[in-house]
Structures are given as structure tokens and as C-alpha cells.
Amino acid sequence: MIWVFKNAGAKIVQEIINHQNFLEINSLFQNLTNESTCLNELSLLETTGLGEASFGTRQEEARVYEDGGYWGHVRKLSRSPKPSSEAVEQVSREIQGSSQLCWEVYNPFDRMAFLAGFLTFERWLGMVEAGFNASLGVTGWKMGFDAGDLTVDPGETVKLEDVILMIGEDPWLLLEEFGDLIRRKHGIMPLKNPPVSWCSWYPFRLSVNEEHVLENARIGAERLKSLGLKNIQVDLGWEKDYLPSSYDENKQFPHGLKWLSEQLGKMGFNLGVWKAPFVISEHDPVAAQHPEWLLGDEKEKPAPYWTWFWKPYGKVYALDLTHPEAQNYLREKMASLAKKGVKYFKLDFMNGPCNPRLRNRYNRRIVAGGGVEAARLGCRIIAETLRSIDPECLVLNCNPYEPCGLGYFQLLYTCNDTGNTGYVTWQFMKENYRAVASHLWKNHRLGIIEPSCLCVGPPGTLEEARIRATVAFLSGGEISISDNLTTLPEERWQVLLSILPPAGFSAKPVDLFEPVTVEQLSYEEMSRSGREASAGNIEEEGGNIWVQRVDTEWDSWIIVSLFAWDPPKTREGREHLITRFNIPWSLLGLNPDRKYWVYEFWSSQFLGEAPSKSLRNSYTHPGDAGKLLWSATEETLQVTFFGPAVRVLAIREKRQHPWIVGTSFHLTSGGELRNVTWDETGKVLKGELQRPVGQLGFIVATGISTKRVEATVDNRPASVQHGANGSIIIPMVSTEHPLRWEIRLEEQ
């Protein structure tokens, strides 16, 4: 296709390539004039009038995936993309939404999804925008980008970003396939195993010092090293004058980074540091000595784009990465850190050079503000510099303009900062972790994701710690621990230990595009009537149910995590309304014609068999919620509990003999066990536990047909305790070698 724009003196040539599973559109822009032209905003695909785009039956109920790097969600096409706390009533107004990199719409009535994405992002940040009006329908849809005031010479032809269009019945599968296309196109080779790191930020912030780091490393070596802890990362606070642009140590690190890296190396750890390499503080001599290295706007150069939040405050500028001398400065400074033994780099505030206001630059034939070319150039310089010194170094890309570091850095920050426990609101946590749910498809495709730092210690509640830990584990990405290990209470240690080592693969948010019914039940009405008493449904967005499959050599099962994000609603100021999830078995990928055993990890409660007629009572009262499983019919699994909380169900197929249904050691409820077997002749269930030395816990078994049961742990008699719903519990303490255990059934 050829599009000629006579008034602009330009031409766009588009080639459509029909692949087996998608359409690819490659585009070229040509300046037809005898003068240089400025390329600003550009649309590659666009509808120009009402009715030109339609997303199927009852399209107002269609669900739209939108991505903003650190944020992400799936919403109704007819619902505002703003958080519920900010949204205003949208009755007759037009709703506008946008998404970077890719956009998707799914119609649950037609069971059809359409994905539009950018296959390349070398110079520009591709965006998809859509408008909807309840009365008029889709008011507009386009794919394009801010071209960043790129100078195009007379007669010059410029390659634009490639886009793809995909359709399919499974919206999540389309996202995964899109991620695979990105991975192959850009030669991304994700790490096989996600790293485990410790970060100084939340326990210490600017007060961090050498001794803090070494004290935490010593405890980490004792309790976490065998579970994968490898990187000890010093966040903002080590730099001279606390400047984000300083590469020299302050007095809190009197021996310097090189000495610290050597001390950590003796413990088997790598030193990591935080750095904001594209940020220059007004207090840094560079700002005064080399203003030409900094980006400007249409009024001034350099132009500050933000006021630094922490000491010493002040204005900050973005490095002009189109300037050769600024590039050399970046090479020199990053190399200096690698030469000091730094092997892990948390690179933050990487979005400055992309700021749409900062278009005034040294080389106008490289896109800076408004695009990603200059930032990608800077990321390439960093990657090449660091790997020329240490090919094994790791880099975490912290940039809401996600494409800037794709293909250069292995680790991908995938949500907003989590904050210390207790301080952030449940609403923020819900929106932030739903963003993680939206981004799980990126793991092992665009890189290894990191859902920000993991804090499990006080002052927040134990339930909050469990929510954070569950998200960190089921994300399947890097786990970055950010608690003071020298003061962490033992109850929080149990939370932390239970999610290590990392899963290595992500869960699937099965309700993201098709939210399940979430009900509220009335305490007073159930007490009075003896029947179920619904107080209405909660219209929830998806991202509350994450499912992960666990495969071992002795069994396979699924982990189902249910997130109730909100505090209980009240009615008439007298009662809390409890939350009930109504989950179709089909959503979990399970066959309701089969029988399953269900175990909840955080409460260590065996919930019994499901589906089960015994869970259905003619008389219902509020105390029934203590069973957690409210009902389990052939169609639906009903789980009831008060939020904010998380429940993690391990669901296995029922056996015709005794079998393990859960443990207290690891969130997988059995992934830490090996060689589990049942000997029918000897009536013996046995296996091995593999955990760090000294961890106290238990395993849970069911299917016991005799009253007399004996157990041994490490060939010594062990206690047998009766648990919930006919289960038995065998306490044990892990040892250096695999801990062997046996459960023997004696004849009556």
C-alpha cells in the first residue's frame, strides 16, 4: 500500500506480510521535498469515523488489555481506565484508553480476541489508542507513535516500526505468542533460573552503610544462601552526597565498593548497586561543566524535568545520549563500577531521555524525548560496557518505557514500587499486583520479571506479608528481598522461607479476561434463616485467581491462589460481609467428574475432597465459613474468607491409597519432597524432604484407612497428629542430608 500526503510532501509505503498466525505490516516513510522535514506524530493504522471499528456482540462488555510498563489492567471497554478511586461516572462521555507495545480486546460472548502490537521498537514507543462511547460505540482506534521531532533529510527514506495483528479464541495465549515473537525477533535469551537478591532500600534507605550490608549478608549466608540468595544489592544511599549521578562512595562506605565486593565474595555473594545512569543532579559538577550533555525543551537547554524526591533534593536533568561525549561519560562511569567488582546493577529512572518534553538535543537525527532511540542507545552502551568486563553480570531494567532495555538487560521491573509493609493502601496494592498479573506473560519472554522488592517484615500485618510473598513466588521471576534480616521476626522468616527457591515459571491469572462471580454473604440473614443469604455480588475486575501447575517426579497438581484485596464491606454498621469466590472447575482446567483433594497452604488446613456432597448442607449458618470450602459442586468450587487476604489451594487428584496432600515448608505444598511412593504390600508411604538445615515444619497426608498409624523421620519414631478432615500431620526438622520419612499403616 502506498499513501501519498501531498500537503506534507511525504509518502508512506506499507507491506502486509501474511504469516501463518498473524499479519505483519512493515512501513517506510519518505520525504518527497527538497528540504529537511520534522517528523512528529505518526499513525500507522487508524479508523477515521464512527462505526469503522466494532468488537463484536455486546461490545460494551468486551474486555480490553492495556499496558503501561509499570501499570497494566484488563477492563471493560465501557469502563474508564482510571482507577476506581479516580474514575468519574461515564454515562455519555467518551472513554479513552491507551497502551504501549501491545493492546488487546476480548469479546466473551463471541469468544474471540484481537491483538495489535509493535514487533519493533528501535526508535519509537508504539502506542495503541481506542475511544468508546456507550451511545455511539467505538469512536476511534489507532496505532502509531510520537516521532520525537526527528529530522528527515530531503529524499530520505526512514524505516518505521513493524506492527502485527493477531486473532484467536484465547486472549492469554495471544499475549504469550506475541511475547514469543518479540523474544525471537530481538534475540532475547532469558535466564534459565530467576535470581534471588537482597536489597537495602526498604530496611535502610539513605542510612545504609557497610556494616548493615555485611550483617545482612552474614545472616543471608546462614539461612538463605542454600535457597538461592546470590546478590547483595546496595540501593540509593552509598553515593557521595546521596547524588543519583555520583559514582563515588560516601563516608558510610569508608572501605569502598571494591573492598565490599571482596568481603561479599568470601561469603559466596555478588555485590549489586543501585544507579540512575541517565539522571544528572543540579548539584553534580557535570551539570555546570557540561550543560551540552543534557537534554532541553523548546524553551531552554538544559531543561530540568523533575525535582529529586530525596536528599539533597534539587532539580534533575536527563543525559543527552545523542551526544558522543555524553556517551563516553556513560561508558566510563559504568565501567568504573564493574571494575570495582559490582556484578548486579539495578538501573533506575531510565525514562528521562524519553520524556516527551525533552526534544532539544545534540543530534536531531536520533530520537530522544518522545521516543526510545536515545534511551536504547544508552542501554546498549551500558550492556556492551559491562559485559566486556564481566560477561556474567546482571542488569535490572527499571523503566516504565519498557522497550528501552528489551534485548539488552536480563531483568525487567514490572510494577510500581511496593513500599514498606503497612503504609501503602490496600487499593494501591490491589492495582499494583493486578498489574503484575497482567504482565505475567512477559516472564521468560521479554526477560525475567521482578515484581518490585519483597517486604514481609513489620510494621504490616502477617496477612499482608503472605499476600506479598504469594505474588512474588507466583510471578515466577526474580525475588528481591528487602527486609532487615537482623531483626526479622521468626513468623515472617517462615513466610520468606516458604517461597524459596523461586518457582522459575509464572502462574496464569485465569480470571483476567473473564472475572468470576464474587459474592457477599450476610451474617445476620444466615443466622436468622439457616440458608445462604447473598448480600449481592461485587463487580470485580480480573487478576484475583492465579493458577500454577507443579510437576514433580512423584506427582502433578495445581496451585490456586485467591486474592481478596479489599477489607470486608459493612452493612448498617453492624456486620461484616464475607467474600465468596464462585470458581468454575473449567476455569481451573480440572475435570469435575474426577475427585480431588484440596489443601490450603497458609493455614495448613486440609479441606477434604471436592466435588463433595458432604459440603452441601440443608441448614447453613455463618460458622460454615470456617471450613473455607463453602461448597464444591460438579460445576463450581466455592471458597469463602474475609479479606484482605490470600488463600493458596493445592489441588491434587484423589488417590485410592494414602498420599501427601500438603506441607508447611514450601508454597507448592510438596515441591520440596522427593521420591514419594506408596507400597501397597507393606502399607508404607515414604519419601524425602529437601530443605535447609534446621527448618521446622510438617507434612500432611490423607486417605488413611486404619486408626493405627506409625511414622519415622530419619529412622527415628515420629509423632503422628490428627489434622483437619481426616488428615494426619508428621512434624519434622530438616537436616543436612535429604530427610527420609515413612508413614506405616498397621492392620486393625
Each model region followed by its residue ranges:
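Beta-strand-rich recognition/accessory modules
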Residues: H19, L44-L45, P83-P194, P459
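Solvent-exposed beta-hairpin/edge-strand motifs
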Residues: T47-Q59, W585-S604, T702-N715
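Non-catalytic C-terminal accessory domains or segments of carbohydrate-active enzymes
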Residues: E532, W557, S561, S618-Q748
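Polysaccharide-binding surfaces and accessory modules of carbohydrate-active proteins
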Residues: M1-A130, R594
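Active-site-proximal substrate-binding groove within the catalytic cores of carbohydrate-active enzymes
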Residues: E156-T157, G371-I651
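Aromatic- and carboxylate-enriched substrate-binding clefts and catalytic-loop regions
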Residues: S226-G460, E464, R492
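Surface-exposed beta-strand/loop patches in extracellular or lumenal glycoproteins
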Residues: C38-T47, D566-P592, Q690-T706
